[in-house]
Every structure is written in structure tokens, then in C-alpha cells.
Design a protein with these regions (language model features):
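Conserved acidic functional residues
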Residues: 163-164, 181
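Glycine-rich phosphate-binding active-site loops on the catalytic face of alpha/beta enzymes
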Residues: 179-188
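Residue-level "edge-of-site" marker
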Residues: 71, 162, 186
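Hydrophobic/aromatic residues located in beta-strands of well-ordered beta-sheets
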Residues: 95-97, 159, 183
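Buried, small/hydrophobic-residue-enriched core segments of structured protein domains
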Residues: 1-155, 165-169
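Conserved dinucleotide-binding and phosphotransfer motif residues
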Residues: 176
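Hydrophobic alpha-helical positions that pack around
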Residues: 173
Length: 188
């Protein structure tokens, strides 16, 4: 029970720091074994997280499974655009594209916008879509990404972030005026 209490408490602190933004539990890869990952995800949900990246925990506890693809997904394709397009075709109802594998502002966000435009032009409803930032100056990158998305007519696209986040970093990013509205937390 100590492990789960610790995770639930930490999740609660992170949720409070996010001030209404959604927190997704991304802790499986850092868990001390599969059981710790499953029960840690459950504890994070008790602490206020809106979903988990842990598919088994989602099945066992009937909680929402949320997340995006990894950098390795993008690197397994000949180029970033093809990776994004393939992912969007597989998950048109929940399309979140990880835009910082190569160059966030010069290729990642522009390629995401290209895919979103193609989805819109094909008549695919854009309801739950956005981008994820996982490195760099998250406050700056989110502000610049928001400008690019808005200029392209995707002002309802969300910006999610991960990257060793905890309640203190989330508070700092919010104080800097970041444009992030959902957070993937698990390393810390």
C-alpha cells in the first residue's frame, strides 16, 4: 500500500499544479516491474489523472487509455510526414502527433499541420487532436507552436507536453504563460 499511496499523493499534487488541465499517467516504463506499473497507474487515477498510457491497467481497471506514439515510431518511417500520416490514418479520432523528434518548429509542427489539413479536407472530423512536445524549452515551444496552429486555422488543436515533468515544473511552465493544456507525467 505504501507504493500506491505515494503515487496517488504525487498524482494529486501534479493535478493541483496543472490547475484544471488534464494529467495523463505515463509511468509504466519507469515502474519497478509490471505489477508496480499496473497498480501505479491505478493509484495515479485515484490521485486525479484523466487516463493512463498503460493498456493493461486500462483493461483491468476500466480507465481511459491515453497517449501518443514514441520517437521510435517516427524514426521507423522514411520521414516525419509519412509517420504522422500513417498514425493519423490509424487513429483519426484521437490524433496526437509528437512533433519534436527532429525540429519542432521547422518540421514537426508544419508536418502536423499538413496532416491536420489533409484530414479536414478529407472530411475527417477533427475533435480530439493536437501535438505533443517532449523536449526543449516547453514554454517557448508551446507558444510558437500555438501561433503556427492558430495561423493555420487549428485553434482548437491541443498542445500536450511530457519530458520529466513534475508539479514544480508544471507550475513554472504555467507561470511562464505556456500554451500547454494537457500533461503526460510519469518519470518523476
Amino acid at each position: 500500500i505504501n507504493h500506491q499511496s505515494l503515487i496517488a499523493t504525487k498524482a494529486s499534487r501534479v493535478v493541483c499544479a496543472a490547475k484544471g488541465d488534464g494529467i495523463m499517467e505515463f509511468g509504466l516504463r519507469r515502474a519497478q516491474g509490471p505489477d508496480a506499473g499496473v497498480y501505479g497507474a491505478r493509484a495515479a487515477m485515484i490521485g486525479g489523472c484523466i487516463g493512463t498510457s498503460n493498456v493493461l491497467a486500462g483493461q483491468l481497471f476500466d480507465v481511459p487509455v491515453k497517449g501518443t506514439h514514441a520517437h521510435s515510431w517516427i524514426m521507423s518511417f522514411p520521414d516525419e510526414y509519412t509517420a504522422f500520416k500513417t498514425y493519423a490514418n490509424m487513429y483519426p479520432d484521437a490524433c496526437c502527433l509528437l512533433v519534436d523528434t527532429y525540429d519542432t518548429l521547422k518540421s514537426g509542427v508544419p508536418n502536423a499541420i499538413r496532416v491536420f489539413e489533409e484530414m479536414r479536407n478529407a472530411g475527417i472530423p477533427l475533435k480530439n487532436y493536437g501535438i505533443r512536445l517532449d523536449s526543449g524549452d516547453l514554454a517557448y515551444m508551446s507558444k510558437q507552436a500555438r501561433k503556427l496552429l492558430d495561423a493555420a486555422g487549428f485553434d482548437d488543436a491541443y498542445i500536450s507536453a511530457s519530458s520529466d515533468l513534475d508539479e514544480y515544473l508544471i507550475e513554472s511552465l504555467k507561470a511562464q504563460g505556456c500554451k500547454i493544456t494537457s500533461w503526460g507525467v510519469g518519470t518523476n
